[in-house]
Amino acid sequence: MSLFLCLIAGILAFGIPAKADQWLCGPSFGSVNARGSDVRSIPIRLAKPETVDALIATSRPDILWRLADIAFVPEFEDAALSAMQNGASAITDLLAYDQTPDFAGRHLADMRDGFGQLWQEKLLEAGLVMLLPETGRPIDALLAAEQSAMSQQIGLWAPGQSPAYHYAGSSEIDGDLPDAARAVGRFAVIDGILQRIEDREWRSYLNFGSDWRNDFTVMVDRDLRDAIKTAGQHMEDWIGHKIRVRGMIEDRGGPYLELTNPASLCVEQSVGQP
């Protein structure tokens, strides 16, 4: 059989992989510079990690580092630490974003291997961590890595994972995601189709169902609403499209999320594009 026929047979047998979801995320919703393009790269050699969130470079053992824009979850922290211990020797450089340490004395940074891939990407692709935007830096590559793990349903995104971290904010979402009402009290990722927007002087409510008293709602305060508009986005254009948000889910009659970081809200790629 020719190579061409073999390829056709393989496609028929296994199907064509579905295209991963593409997103536009705040605060810029698409117009971004390359992550770390304005930060000097520092060559490093890492000590073998003893914990996931207190990393040490052998040249400066007095400084603790934490990987930026990701969060470790309890159920997968041991697996993440094992992966980091196995991969630490491949890390060759560091991008330090803030000279001010956090409450635990750690500095936020990106770390990359010799091929230029972020360590955070590798952990996200394996489904061992969650994306948690916090630096204001572009998250496109990190979001794509997390989406890959979601699409493959691996790690913390696996079906039946308890507790779940990915929920449906509206009935129109395809698949078997649990309802957002089950996410109350947890930090979670919620996908939903935006139904309508209620604007008030100091805030806007993004409603993902016909009854705001019971359905999933996202609150956007006036400052964030203005920032979204400044970025060239009109929230009314999002109606009927898939939205992804992440944060702590509260119970306000129905599941409710107060948006605190525009990077925690993403919209289908088609929105706002020519």
Write out the residue ranges for each language-model feature.
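Bacterial N-terminal signal peptides
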Residues: 2-13
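N-terminal signal peptide c-region/cleavage motif recognized by signal peptidases
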Residues: 15-17
